[in-house]
Amino acid sequence: MPSALESRLIDLESRLTHQEAMVDDLSDVIAAQDRTIARLVVQIRHLAGALRDVELGSIGSPADDKPPPHY
């Protein structure tokens, strides 16, 4: 039968092993989130540029505004 000190050491080693596995898992999650955030930033920049183009394209001079055909 292991002594109290040996039992504590085994318990600590077991906890350390679980913590190391958890740190590795969390690191993987963070890396995946970083990739997702980078992809979303690119998409937002693209959408912002497209929106800007639409806004600039829809702003014209009042002379360009023609009355609807039913007038």
Curated annotation (Swiss-Prot):
Domain of life according to the entry: Bacteria
One Pfam short name: SlyX
InterPro entries xref list: SlyX
Family (UniProt): Belongs to the SlyX family.
Protein name: Protein SlyX homolog
